[in-house]
């Protein structure tokens, strides 16, 4: 039997205010890494009516025109007019970025005889399951695809009344550990004042929901909740303040796996909150791809300034073809989970992060998403 009879996950679009903040933080990170791959970056963003504020700590040898960059990110998302409630061309941009603490740098930097220490203490999780082709939990996978489709139809002009802010939620029914039906789907989308609710409901149901969710999972009792509160004209940073790092479950596994609590966006790869979570996904995905388990969760923990993980644990939820203790031995043999090792293993010192900041850090097999590769699976299979 499945651990859950039903399970629900949610996602939000690139125009959601928290996701705007994530994208701005990661755009700043990318701009710095482009010229200075060894930079130390920790950037937080706040967006609210008429303003975007960035703050944090950076140590770099390069210069970035932050104001122009931030404005362009906002415009690219689709906030380009007061008619939609926010305009990247005219909003205020405030910069409160300072230098990284020398005390932190002393413990984290690499020396001639020293490995890179972890940028902070903490615990991170990685997860994979064979219930989808990309080895992600189905509820979060399809929740992402719904809001991604909303953005596609908005940007193409096919549904010109769509606006950038949107949220989705998918409830799947499980039988014997596999998803078999959609019990409920929620999609709320910002829209122009001129469109009627009936048109919104029909277009969202036919062009978004039915184009994304498997037809065999939709049934006569599936609940469709489309803009259930009625009109959704006021959205984005006007409707809600947006902050970096407030969608950590959307960013990861939709609640299907545990989370260490650290956000990803705006952090360079010396911050294990991000890099070790990516490495955890890489490890778990390769374990499942190798057939060692149907699902796998890994936890890794670190102490600030110390290279070796303080712990590595594995849980295959009774689906492992080998004991979990044996799988941990394989992980230690095939994966270097020290900060420098995982940065090199996944080639993380690159300007690749803005594209991670909307529609999921995991489960999208894009060329730059090295943590989604299954290139260790063949070697792991030999243990069977």
Curated annotation (Swiss-Prot):
Residues 100-110 are annotated as: Flexible loop. The lineage of its organism: Bacteria, Pseudomonadati, Pseudomonadota, Gammaproteobacteria, Cellvibrionales. Transmembrane segments: none annotated. It comes from Cellvibrio japonicus (strain Ueda107). Catalyzes the formation of S-adenosylmethionine (AdoMet) from methionine and ATP. The overall synthetic reaction is composed of two sequential steps, AdoMet formation and the subsequent tripolyphosphate hydrolysis which occurs prior to release of AdoMet from the enzyme. GO terms for molecular function: ATP binding; magnesium ion binding; methionine adenosyltransferase activity. The keyword Protein biosynthesis does not apply. K(+) binds at residue 44. Pathway: Amino-acid biosynthesis; S-adenosyl-L-methionine biosynthesis; S-adenosyl-L-methionine from L-methionine: step 1/1. This is S-adenosylmethionine synthase.
């Amino acid at each position: 039997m499945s651990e859950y009879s039903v399970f629900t996950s949610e996602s939000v679009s690139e125009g959601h205010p928290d996701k705007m903040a994530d994208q701005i933080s990661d755009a700043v990170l990318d701009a710095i890494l482009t010229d200075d791959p060894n930079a130390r970056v920790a950037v937080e963003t706040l967006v609210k009516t008429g303003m975007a504020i960035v703050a944090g700590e950076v140590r770099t040898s390069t210069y970035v025109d932050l104001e122009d960059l931030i404005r362009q990110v906002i415009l690219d998302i689709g906030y380009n007019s007061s008619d939609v409630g926010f305009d990247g061309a005219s909003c205020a941009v405030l910069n409160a970025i300072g230098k990284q603490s020398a005390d932190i740098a002393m413990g984290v930097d690499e020396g001639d005889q020293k490995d890179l220490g972890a940028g902070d203490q903490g615990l991170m999780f990685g997860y994979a399951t064979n219930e989808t082709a990309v080895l992600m939990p189905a509820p979060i996978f399809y929740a992402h695809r719904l809001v991604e489709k909303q953005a596609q139809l908005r940007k193409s002009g096919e549904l010109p009344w769509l606006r950038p802010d949107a949220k989705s939620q998918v409830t799947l029914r499980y039988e014997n550990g596999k998803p078999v039906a959609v019990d409920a789907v929620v999609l709320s989308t910002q829209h122009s004042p001129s469109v009627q609710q009936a048109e919104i409901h029909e277009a969202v149901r036919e062009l978004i929901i039915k184009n994304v969710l498997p037809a065999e999972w939709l049934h006569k009792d599936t609940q469709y909740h489309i803009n259930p509160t009625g009109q959704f004209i006021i959205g984005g940073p006007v409707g809600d303040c947006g902050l970096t790092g407030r969608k950590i479950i959307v960013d990861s596994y939709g609640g299907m796996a545990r989370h260490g609590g650290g956000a990803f966006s705006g952090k360079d790869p010396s911050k294990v909150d991000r890099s070790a979570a990516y490495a955890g996904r890489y490890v778990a995905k390769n374990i499942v791809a190798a057939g060692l388990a149907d699902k796998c969760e890994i936890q890794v923990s670190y102490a600030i300034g110390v290279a070796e993980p303080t712990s590595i644990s594995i849980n295959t939820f009774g689906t492992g073809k080998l004991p979990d203790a044996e799988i941990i031995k394989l992980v230690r043999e095939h994966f270097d989970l020290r900060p420098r090792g995982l940065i090199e293993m996944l080639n993380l010192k690159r300007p690749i992060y803005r594209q991670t900041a909307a529609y999921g850090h995991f489960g999208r097999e894009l060329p730059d998403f090295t943590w989604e590769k299954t290139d260790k699976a063949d070697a792991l299979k030999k243990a069977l």
